[in-house]
Amino acid sequence: MELIEKHASFGGWQNVYRHYSQSLKCEMNVGVYLPPKAENEKLPVLYWLSGLTCNEQNFITKSGMQRYAAEHNIIVVAPDTSPRGSHVADADRYDLGQGAGFYLNATQAPWNEHYKMYDYIRNELPNLVMHHFPATARKSISGHSMGGLGALVLALRNPDEYASVSAFSPIVSPSQVPWGQQAFAAYLGENKDAWLDYDPVSLISQGQRVAEIMVDQGLSDDFYAEQLRTSNLEKICQEMNIKTLIRYHEGYDHSYYFVSSFIGEHIAYHANKLNMR
């Protein structure tokens, strides 16, 4: 991994690395925050998945998470949201193509050559992190919007691999809303059964489980009613007896002003779960 940025932050280092991804067949950037204790010991890892139009920079520059990661001794890994490059398929819209990988494995041309974000996040990136950084095998996952969707899907499909999962403003029923329907049709084809593998509410209804889900949702979020539908997740978790910590916040929108307001509580939540044995 090639170091391309290095910034001192809260006694640790906010770095950005570039590497070639075998899963995605392109160069990828990834933000890695190493707290002070990483100098002398191995630490657990929180993976953060960002939303539509984002890259590795949004979370590391806007959330203020470094303060809390340093306090709780957690390495934070923030990858890009899709494969990148002039040779990678793209679309002339913000919600499909580069910047909109949806954390799935595409099966349809032209997307299936590079868009394997599920494999990248689940397998390739953790292996790189374990090899290059002082990381233990303990990991949790979180994200925002499209990234919240990705975090929920990865945790629900691999409950033994993640100590905890949380999300800000996640797309919880992508097969039922425009963002998800458009992306899934392009990436996965018209067989809607294939879509359900990447739909958190559907996965839970089929019996997939995690111990607990934490979600924060702003009630002034312009996308809440049409695209996010947090109440669908709350309802299915109640029906399936999955413990939740779902909080609704008056006045908060879909932006990083919202994420930065509550990221400290999410990191504390994950720290507690990561330190349990």
Curated annotation (Swiss-Prot):
Class of enzymatic activity (EC top level): hydrolase
GO BP terms: formaldehyde catabolic process
Function in brief: Serine hydrolase involved in the detoxification of formaldehyde. Hydrolyzes S-formylglutathione to glutathione and formate.
Recorded family membership: Belongs to the esterase D family.
GO molecular function: carboxylic ester hydrolase activity; S-formylglutathione hydrolase activity
Entries under Pfam families matching the protein: Esterase
Protein name as annotated: S-formylglutathione hydrolase FrmB
Record keywords, A-Z: Hydrolase, Serine esterase
EC number(s) given by UniProt: 3.1.2.12
Family matches, as NCBIfam families: fghA_ester_D
Catalyzed reaction equations: S-formylglutathione + H2O = formate + glutathione + H(+)
Active-site feature positions: 145 (charge relay system), 221 (charge relay system), 254 (charge relay system)
GO cellular component: cytosol
Species whose genome carries this gene: Escherichia coli O6:H1 (strain CFT073 / ATCC 700928 / UPEC)
Keyword Membrane (UniProt): no
